[in-house]
Amino acid sequence: MFGRAPKKSDSTRYYEILGVPKDASPEDLKKAYKKAAIKNHPDKGGDPEKFKELAHAYEVLSDPEKREIYDQYGEDALKEGMGGGGGMHDPFDIFQSFFGGSPFGGVGSSRGRRQRRGEDVVHPLKVSLEDLFTGTTKKLSLSRNVICSKCTGKGSKSGASMKCSGCQGTGMKVSIRHLGPSMIQQMQHPCNECKGTGETINDKDRCPQCKGEKVVQEKKVLEVVVEKGMQHGQKITFPGEADEAPDTVTGDIVFVLQQKEHPKFKRKGEDLFYEHTLSLTEALCGFRFVLTHLDGRQLLIKSNLGEVVKPDQFKAIEDEGMPIYQRPFMKGKMYIHFTVEFPDSLNPDQVKSLEAILPPKPSMSLTYMELDECEETTLHNVNIEEEMKRKQTQAQQEAYDEDDEPAGGQRVQCAQQ
């Protein structure tokens, strides 16, 4: 309600904007708006403010109630709330109500574009073998681009943009490089003026929140659930959590599990392999030791009475391997690989004691005369890996020295007669 009657006005500005007389019919208004809107559309290089004014003028004059109030009392009456208020719709929505999208064949248009799919963002996630055995949850803080809430991804205050003059709205530029006589190379690259968007925004019209970038940075914490039995290289996907962009279906954030090496355990599928070294006494007379499992449980490992463990032998324990993924109550096997450590030397008394206990040595079939004819040799200790490396290095050095040697002496020449 007004405290006093509004003043009469003979405002004709909205009619002038559309270029029609005050007695124009609804059909005349439609034709005038369509013609002027296409001409001034930002995607065709038109003035964003002019485009906005055209939409507002048509919105008022096409509504019989608002038009009557405007004709009698002018713009101020609409702003003060007569005729349902002075708020206006998005100028692009009004334009789209006529054409159902872009009348320009989609070239450079910021609306009616076919959406492309954004790229997935892939992160490696380091986990221990213990994590994969027991399962764990990791909280990770990430930064990503999201559509600006102030301009809803348009980049401008008015919602308008202009076709980039540098690339003619294609978002790409072609450069030619001369490689030589009659040879050129043609290369296509994103336009540096519009950053490949095909659009530019007037500096004065840029959104104050995103500065015309259409997106802003957002920090987000994701809870990554690593389930029991997951494998090295397995992917955990968060659909639609990657960087947002206008006219783009948001990609996924993907975490790829990277298992760290374990000092004692090795994993092969659903089985675990454990390395353990026995002394010679343990291998011959029996052993007993405690194995700490990946979940902290203590397992007592012992040999059977009278059992002899040979070097490089394997023993298996059922249901102590890795949990099977998505079937956590089922597990593989644990294999224990035994290495036997021998003493460096024995004194004569120890040798006699062992000979009395152990099976007899094989007897030699050679006679004393045949033994006298044999040549004696001397054995010495060697680290075979270091020995092979030394020989390889020596061979490489000799080859290098040969390459550095100067050409041989003067060639033999035939004496001239």
UniProtKB/Swiss-Prot annotation:
Q: What induces it?
A: By heat shock, and in response to NaCl stress.
Zn finger spans (CR-type) = 135-219
Q: Where are the CXXCXGXG motif repeats?
A: 148-155, 164-171, 191-198, 207-214
This protein's source sits in the domain of life called Eukaryota
Subcellular location per UniProt equals: Membrane
Please give the GO cellular component terms listed in this UniProt entry.
Answer: membrane
The J domain covers 11-76
What InterPro entries does the record point to? DnaJ, DnaJ_C, DnaJ_domain, DnaJ_domain_CS, DNJA1/2-like, HSP40/DnaJ_pept-bd, HSP_DnaJ_Cys-rich_dom, HSP_DnaJ_Cys-rich_dom_sf
S-S pairs: none
Q: Where is the lipid attached (S-farnesyl cysteine)?
A: C414
Q: Where is this region: Disordered?
A: 384-417
Write out the propeptide range(s). Answer: 415-417
| Topology of the protein relative to the lipid bilayer | Lipid-anchor
Q: Does the keyword Transmembrane helix apply?
A: no
Xref: Gene3D superfamilies: DnaJ domain, Heat shock protein DnaJ, cysteine-rich domain, Urease metallochaperone UreE, N-terminal domain
User: What this chain does, per the record?
Assistant: Plays a continuous role in plant development probably in the structural organization of compartments.
This protein is called DnaJ protein homolog ANJ1
What organism is this sequence from? Answer: Atriplex nummularia (Old man saltbush)
